[in-house]
Structures are given as C-alpha cells and as structure tokens.
Amino acid sequence: MIWLVLILASLLSVTGQLCQKQATRPVAINKRRKHIALWLGLGLVCLGLAMVLWLLVLQTVPVGIAYPMLSLNFVWVTLAATKLWHEPVSFRHWCGVAFIIGGIVILGSTV
C-alpha cells in the first residue's frame, strides 16, 4: 500500500512541475494573467498534496530507500514532455531513464 502512496506522491509532484511549465507557455496577452494563475494554482495544489503523501511515506519507509524512488519523477517528466510538448529526447537521455528505472527496481526489491 505504501508503495502506491509513494507512486502517487511522485505523480502529483510531477504534475505540479508540469503545471509550472504550462504556466510559462505563450498565450494571448489578454489571457496571460488568467492562464498563469490557473496553472500555477493547480501546480501548488498538486505539489502540496504530494508533500502530504510524501510525509506519509517517510513514516514507514527508510529515507535512504524512499528518496531515490523519487527518481521516478525524471522518468514521468521525460514521458510527459515528449507527449505534451513534443520535446526531443536523445538516445543518451533514454539510456539515463533506463538506468533510473533499473536502480528503482534494484532498490525496491531490497525492501
């Protein structure tokens, strides 16, 4: 159960970061203030919820195991950036993502 909470905390944290990125996207000048307020507001809500869930995780999982699991954020952000904004990702970057996933699997199997 706690691993699901950790994954949810990671996804909420990433969603908050993606909302911040979306807030920086260009929009018509007459819609800019509303656009920024919306996306930054959503980002703050997601990051706040992620922090609450993270505190729940830290109550039961050793920080030396839990913290590296947040490397999942790099994986989620890479996937989202390629899908949402069509950002290019190099082969080297994908190799890094694969290493992160491998590290998470190794650490996760030790608990």
From Swiss-Prot:
The chain crosses the membrane at residues 38-58, 61-81, 88-108. It is a multi-pass membrane protein. It comes from the Bacteria. GO terms for molecular function: carbohydrate derivative transmembrane transporter activity. Residues 40-109 form the EamA domain. The keyword tRNA processing does not apply. The keyword Cell cycle does not apply. Its main location: membrane. GO terms for cellular component: plasma membrane. Residues 1-37, 82-87 are cytoplasmic. Keywords: Cell inner membrane, Cell membrane, Lipid A biosynthesis, Lipid biosynthesis, Lipid metabolism, Lipopolysaccharide biosynthesis, Membrane, Transmembrane, Transmembrane helix, Transport. Pathway: Bacterial outer membrane biogenesis; lipopolysaccharide biosynthesis. It is found in: Cell inner membrane. Residues 59-60, 109-111 are periplasmic. GO terms for biological process: lipid A biosynthetic process; lipopolysaccharide biosynthetic process. Translocates 4-amino-4-deoxy-L-arabinose-phosphoundecaprenol (alpha-L-Ara4N-phosphoundecaprenol) from the cytoplasmic to the periplasmic side of the inner membrane. Belongs to the ArnE family. Heterodimer of ArnE and ArnF. This is Probable 4-amino-4-deoxy-L-arabinose-phosphoundecaprenol flippase subunit ArnE. The lineage of its organism: Bacteria, Pseudomonadati, Pseudomonadota, Gammaproteobacteria, Enterobacterales. The gene is arnE.
